[in-house]
Amino acid sequence: MLNARATKRYLRSSPRKMRLVIDLIRGKSAAQALATLKFSPKSASKDAEMVLRSAKANVMEKATAANERVDEGKLFVSAAYVNQGPTAKRISPAPMGRAYRIRKRSHHLTIEVSVAQ
């Protein structure tokens, strides 16, 4: 079974927000997942769409290298997950001389695409 993955690291948004988008496409066919991401109003869907297109291209490239033919209709999202990246900490002035900590979160996105049997 041919499969390939694509990863985009250090994306500057909360992992929790990206997980909302990724849960929509996990297990779907690649074409259906792309359509879902394209029409999703979430800003995180743009990054997820780029990674999914890259994973699709990686499968096609692997198939070409192995002299195999792959029907794009048989591709599906076999795994998609979001890991937390580094958190940048900033200080915001607060009342009475105090300071509040602002956490600017980041995450790593991985999408794996496989060929259905």
Task: Label every model-predicted segment.
Residues 1-13, 20, 29-117:
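Structured, basic alpha/beta domains of bacterial-type, RNA-associated proteins
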